[in-house]
Amino acid sequence: MISTKDFRNGLKIEIDGKPYEIVEFQHFKPGKGGAFVRTKLRNMFTGRITDQTFRSGEKVKKPDMATKEMQYLYKDGEDYVLMDLESYEQMNVAADVIATAGGFLKEGETNKALLYNGEVIGIELPASVILEVTQTDPGVQGDRVSNATKPATLETGLGINVPLFINEGDKIKVDTRSSEYLGREK
């Protein structure tokens, strides 16, 4: 059990049998009445944000969650196929569970999968990944306006904006949280 005094951003809790992640919290101590904690919680199944208020000192259940190293094998229709590196068991994970992480998964790459009661509910990505540009228009000579960008498609199918000097075949570093170009890799 987790007390409200232990709340922090990123903490995972369980309410009504569903896992939530604390996105934001604030302790309140009004002049009259008991203290309470206001939170914004993200449902880890749907991604929906909800507001929830807890009385100070209230205890909530800690979810049965684990992280496990899993290898992304391939995409099967709308599903992503992941393999457990310990048991070599393969599982199909729906695209809506993987959500935006799907644009950063390369075949054969290992990532941490977030499991709830033995079922994959998300992928923990590193802060940035290195991906190859597979399609982009060539930069036009003399087109050098400051911070000018052009659209590019990466090897995973993700589309982002890159600077004009980036060409097809270049490897670039991409921020996994914002899908922004961070730099060129050698």
Curated annotation (Swiss-Prot):
Coiled-coil stretches: none
Species the sequence originates in: Maridesulfovibrio salexigens (strain ATCC 14822 / DSM 2638 / NCIMB 8403 / VKM B-1763) (Desulfovibrio salexigens)
Pathway: Protein biosynthesis; polypeptide chain elongation
SUPFAM superfamilies: Nucleic acid-binding proteins, Translation proteins SH3-like domain
Name listed for the protein in its UniProt record: Elongation factor P
A single GO BP: peptide biosynthetic process
Localization terms from the record: Cytoplasm
Signal peptide: none
HAMAP family linked to this entry: EF_P (MF_00141)
InterPro entries for this protein: Elong-fact-P_C, NA-bd_OB-fold, Rib_uL2_dom2, Transl_elong_fac_P/YeiP, Transl_elong_KOW-like, Transl_elong_P/YeiP_cen, Transl_elong_P/YeiP_CS, Transl_elongation_fac_P
Matches recorded under Pfam families: EFP (PF01132), EFP_N (PF08207), Elong-fact-P_C (PF09285)
Record-linked PROSITE patterns: EFP
Keywords linked to the UniProt accession: Cytoplasm, Elongation factor, Protein biosynthesis
GO CC aspect terms: cytoplasm
A GO term, aspect molecular function: translation elongation factor activity
Principal place of residence: cytoplasm
Function: Involved in peptide bond synthesis. Stimulates efficient translation and peptide-bond synthesis on native or reconstituted 70S ribosomes in vitro. Probably functions indirectly by altering the affinity of the ribosome for aminoacyl-tRNA, thus increasing their reactivity as acceptors for peptidyl transferase.
Homology family: Belongs to the elongation factor P family.
